[in-house]
Design a protein with these regions (language model features):
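Short beta-strand scaffold segments in enzyme catalytic cores
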Residues: 13, 37-41, 135-139, 145-146, ...
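Solvent-exposed alpha-helices and their adjacent loops that cap or buttress functional pockets
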Residues: 32, 130-131, 137-140, 156-161, ...
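Glycine/serine-rich anion-binding loops at beta->alpha junctions
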Residues: 87-116, 134, 241-256
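ATP-binding N-lobe of GHMP and related small-molecule kinases
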Residues: 1-96, 114, 118-123, 148-150, ...
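A glycine- and small-aliphatic-rich helix-loop capping segment at beta-alpha/alpha-beta transitions
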Residues: 76, 111-118, 188, 260-262
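Residue-level signal for inorganic ion chemistry
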Residues: 11, 39-41, 67, 101, ...
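Contiguous, small/hydrophobic- and glycine-enriched helical/loop subdomains that border
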Residues: 105, 109-146
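Conserved, helical-rich catalytic subdomain that frames metal- and/or nucleotide-binding sites
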Residues: 50, 141, 145-242, 257-270, ...
Length: 283
């Protein structure tokens, strides 16, 4: 069985505080992208253990890979005694803040449910997703959403325009953990207004998005990797008004209704040596 694992971007990421457990509480606007990995998953004979492979050898495929963790969580939750062969065909860049690992885990949850014809509720699936990571619940349902808390509270939102996305991934990625550690040191210079941003998306007022979007982790990520600021400046110099780092970085995106502009400027940026992806928002 082959399932798609869709990337995401954050049009808003606001850090609201910390839980007693030390997790950062967030308020985010998350949008799924057409850009996706493909997950090839099949049942193995009982004598074998689950194993994960990937066509990108830089990806950790051992027990700490989120696909491996998803299998273990599904087996524990639903008393499954099967093993699986999982191969990841990677299109989503690693360490980019695009939710690739979370998307892979969510795809494995869906695939195991379908392969074994499990009669489980959406709530049960969500419980497994929450136990794996903050972005996995969003990736499981894969619809434009407001995500609150540590990612467990999802509210669907309306996006009433077609949006195209130009992504640039710097050569170096960033780990989410190191970014949050740095955030605790340097704070944020961003102030996204999630309520007003959601309203602008619903009403199709693209021109208002720059007034309300933002990412509280940008300052921390740029401190760790100044190239992120260079990429943002480059995209703005090419005429884009909605330019933001996604998640904890290191990827930066430009959002536009103008598909021709996205395609034209992507070619110009590729000529300058940037690692460029073109995709669009899924609704």
């Amino acid at each position: 069985m082959i399932v798609k694992a869709y990337a995401k971007i954050n049009l808003a990421l606001k850090v609201k505080g910390k839980t007693k457990d030390g997790y950062h509480e967030l308020d985010m606007v998350m949008l799924p992208l057409e850009l996706h990995d493909s997950i090839d998953i099949s049942l193995l004979p009982d004598i074998y253990d689950t194993y994960v492979t990937c066509d990108d050898f830089s990806l950790e495929t051992g027990e700490y890979n989120l696909c491996s963790i998803a299998v273990r969580k599904m087996k524990e939750k639903f008393n499954i005694n099967k093993s699986f062969r999982i191969h990841i065909h990677k299109n989503i860049p690693i360490g980019a803040g695009l939710g690739g690992g979370s998307a892979n885990a969510a795809a494995v949850i869906r695939a195991i449910k379908d392969l074994l014809k499990l009669k489980i509720s959406a709530e049960d699936e969500l419980d497994v997703a929450k136990s794996i990571g903050a972005d996995v619940p969003f990736c499981l349902f894969n619809t434009p959403s407001r995500s609150e808390g540590i990612g467990e509270k999802l509210t669907p939102i309306e996006v009433n325009k077609e949006y195209y996305v130009l992504l640039i991934k710097p050569k170096r990625g960033l780990s989410t953990k190191e970014v949050y550690v740095k955030y605790d040191e340097v704070g944020s210079s961003s102030n996204p207004d999630v309520d007003e941003l959601i309203k602008a998306l619903k009403e199709g007022k693209t021109e208002e998005i720059p007034n309300y979007f933002g990412n509280d982790l940008e300052k921390a990520s740029i401190t760790l990797l100044p190239e992120i600021q260079n990429v943002k400046d480059e995209l703005k110099a090419h005429g884009f008004e909605i330019v933001l780092m996604s998640g904890s970085g290191s990827s930066v995106f430009a959002l536009s209704e103008n598909k021709h502009m996205i395609e034209k400027e992507s070619k110009n940026l590729e000529k300058k040596g940037y690692n460029v992806f073109i995709t669009k928002i899924l609704k």
